[in-house]
């Protein structure tokens, strides 16, 4: 097995809870905004997908900060359901505050895992389908920025493609950001199809199913 130089992580569902799936739960889940305001299940799912498509590939720019993008996101959400006349507790600021309530580590042992990998001399990176504002809240609130160099953070909103793209742009960008060959990277994701795509591009893949399983799989690659 070749030398492993970098471990690249997805964010939602691996390092932090997936904000979208809890704040705007999919059809199979309950909770979040949908239940709090009695919104139609299918409509919330539809609007969530539309807004994801609109912001997943939209980067922060010199004239548009991530906070402005976040406010624009919730303004569009409110307009769709209440046409500028939302009920009490459904303002832009209310939804931003609610977002923070759903920003949590997947497991409290995540920081120790990252520290352990750093102590072994491994470079850590991120490859995530994420918008700018939820990523900033996840990494800022959970104090994860210290583990990842800015150049090693690859997001769909910055690359302009998702991990499902046929061109493998996200995986190529991640390997390039680490300045190592694909074969020297381990990629960790909670979605099996993303892991399979990373492997098809030459990376080692780990399908995340829990912290203990992840540690065992990492040790298998690093100590094998």
Task: Annotate each PLM feature.
Residues 2-108, 112, 119:
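N-terminal helical cap/lid subdomain that shapes the substrate entry/recognition surface
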Residues 8-10, 17, 125-129, 157, ...:
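Short beta-strand segments
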Residues 15-19, 23-25, 133-137, 162-163, ...:
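Short catalytic/ligand-binding loop motif for oxyanion handling, primarily in non-cytosolic enzymes
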Residues 119-121, 202:
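Glycine-centered short loops/turns at secondary-structure junctions
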Residues 132-184:
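Substrate-recognition "cap/lid" segment bordering the active-site pocket of phosphatases
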Residues 170, 190-203:
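Acidic, divalent-metal-coordinating active-site segment for phosphoryl/phosphodiester hydrolysis
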Residues 180-182, 199-207, 211-224:
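C-terminal cap/substrate-recognition subdomain and adjoining C-terminal extension
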Residues 187-188, 207:
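Conserved SAM-binding loop
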């Amino acid at each position: 097995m070749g030398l492993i130089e970098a471990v690249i992580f997805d964010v939602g569902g691996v390092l932090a809870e997936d904000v979208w799936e809890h704040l705007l739960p999919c059809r199979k889940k309950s909770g979040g905004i949908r239940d709090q305001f009695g919104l139609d299940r299918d409509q919330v799912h539809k609007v969530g997908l539309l807004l994801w498509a609109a912001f997943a590939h939209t980067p922060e720019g010199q004239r548009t900060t991530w906070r402005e993008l976040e406010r624009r996101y919730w303004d569009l959400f409110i307009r769709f359901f209440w046409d500028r006349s939302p009920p009490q507790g459904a303002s832009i600021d209310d939804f931003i505050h609610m977002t923070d309530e759903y920003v949590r580590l997947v497991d409290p042992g995540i920081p120790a895992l990252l520290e352990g990998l750093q102590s072994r001399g491994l470079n850590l990176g991120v490859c995530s389908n994420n918008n700018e504002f939820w990523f900033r809240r996840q990494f800022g609130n959970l104090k994860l920025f210290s583990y990842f160099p800015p150049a090693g953070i690859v997001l769909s909103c910055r690359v302009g493609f998702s991990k499902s793209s046929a061109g493998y742009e996200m995986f190529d960008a991640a390997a390039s950001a680490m300045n190592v060959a694909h074969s020297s990277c381990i990629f960790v994701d909670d979605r099996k199809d993303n892991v399979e795509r990373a492997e098809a591009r030459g990376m080692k893949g780990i399908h995340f199913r829990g912290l203990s399983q992840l540690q065992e799989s990492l040790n298998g690659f690093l100590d094998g």
